[in-house]
Every structure is written in structure tokens, then in C-alpha cells.
Amino acid sequence: MTLSSALIKIFITFLFLQNHVNSQYSSPSKPQPSLGSTISFSITKFDDESPNIFVKGDTSISNGVLSLTKTDKYSGKPLQKSVGHATHLTPIHIWDETSGELADFSTSFSFIVNTNGSSLHGDGFTFFLGPLHFDLPKNSSGGYLGLFNPETALIASQNPIVAIEFDSFTNGWDPASPSQYTHIGIDVGSIDSVSTADWPLNVLPRNALGEARINYNSESKRLSAFVDYPGLGESTGVSFVVDLRSVLPEWVRVGFSAATGELVETHDIINWSFEAAL
């Protein structure tokens, strides 16, 4: 055998082995189903070096707090037209295509929305479930809450998203009732909420700490959200029946979005826990 033919044989063998190794250890295109499993996490204090929280846009982590929208680094005042996202990197198997089973999930978090004492402020934040590769939509500041593109915001079939919105400014698609100028709502593929309730933000003292609990029951298919302000005697709740299989992909990520527009406020998440079982 000549030297050149031996080298060719060695090269071909190397390519074969490399391809075999790659086929064994390459990442799958999507997570593998695991029926009967439970996924949970609990974050008591946010860490800017955490590998599990992915922030986009203007969202940042500082002093243990997840700040969804931006403030001026010198004055600390909130900035106009700020948009941000924060998602947990763990994929959530929200329903199973083979069996048709739906997951139950529950989440709770503490938050502060600071209006700086202004009667006019905006625009709010959301807790959402969306596709694994969901990104910040273009032009999603203001009333679109960092979650919807203005062109498709009212077309439910275009948005595989379910969210609980904490809306602090009334837009044209929001409830007309003065009692719901600030409100919480359930969004199913659209910024036009399918169910809303009063959120007493404007009667709260500055920097009031809110506690939110969101649950989904796979049997009743009821999505429920409750907000309480301990020690202040203010609470609210909203619910809606929705089959998540008709809206969401099989695998989702969970997280928060927020936005300011011409009007401003701050949106801070203090802690967060989540659990899902399929």
C-alpha cells in the first residue's frame, strides 16, 4: 500500500468515527417527552449570573431583583418606551401530543410596580407561556406589554401565547369601565383580554408589595389568577376556561414581559416559584 492510499484510508476512518460520535451526542431538536414527570423551581433571590434566567431587551438583574423595564442609571427614574423579557430556560411540557394529556401548573411571585405617585403611568407587565424560541416582538412597547406585535395583537390565531396581564393603562381594547382603568386580565393569543378584573394599583401606597398566584387545572381547564397585598386589605382575582392545547405548542417556556410607553413606571419581580406536572 502506498503512503498516499494509507493516508486516504486513515482520513475516511476518521470521518466515519466522527460522524458516529456526533450522532450519539448531538442535542435533540426538541426536548424528549417524559409523562408522569414534575418540573419545579424556586427563586428566592435573583442572581445576575444565574444560567437559568434569560433576559432580553431592557430587562436586568440587580441587587437580587428582576427589573423588567429600564431606569435611568443616574436618577433611577423609569424610561419611556422600554421593553423587556425574562424567561426560565427550562422547557415545560405543557401537553403531550401522543396521549393528549394536559399538564397542571401553578406559579407564584412577589412584585412591585412603582408609579412614583403619578395618576398617569404605564403600561404594565405579564406572566406568560410561549413557544421555546419566542422573542421580543417588534414595536411592542406601551400597551402591547412587550408581548404582542401591533399588526397581529388582536388576531388570536397568530399568537401561540397565554398570559396574565397586569395592565396599568387603559387602551382602546381594554375594559371601558372606570373601575378597571388598571386591571388584571387573561390573554389568550390576543392583547384583548378574555376576562378582566379590577387591579387596585392606584390606591396603593408607593412600593406596595403584591403577591400573585396563578393556577391551571387540567381537568376543568380553568386558568385562575389571584393578587393580594398583605396587610393592605386589597386583593383581586380572575379566571377563564381555556384548553391550552388549542393555543400553545406542546413545549413552552414561561416568563415575564413588561413595557412602558409615553407614560412610565417600574416593574420589579422579587421572587418566583413554578411547578408543572404532566
UniProtKB/Swiss-Prot annotation:
InterPro entries: ConA-like_dom_sf, L-lectin, Lectin_LegA_CS, Legume_lectin_dom, Leguminous_Lectin. Induction: Accumulates in roots during colonization by arbuscular mycorrhizal (AM) fungi (e.g. Glomus intraradices). The keyword Glycoprotein applies. Glycans are attached at residues 116, 139, 271. Keywords: Glycoprotein, Lectin, Signal. SUPFAM superfamilies: Concanavalin A-like lectins/glucanases. Residues 1-23 form the signal peptide. One of its GO terms (biological process) is response to symbiotic fungus. PROSITE patterns: LECTIN_LEGUME_ALPHA (PS00308). PANTHER family: CONCANAVALIN A-LIKE LECTIN FAMILY PROTEIN, LECTIN 6. Belongs to the leguminous lectin family. This is Lectin 6. It comes from Medicago truncatula.
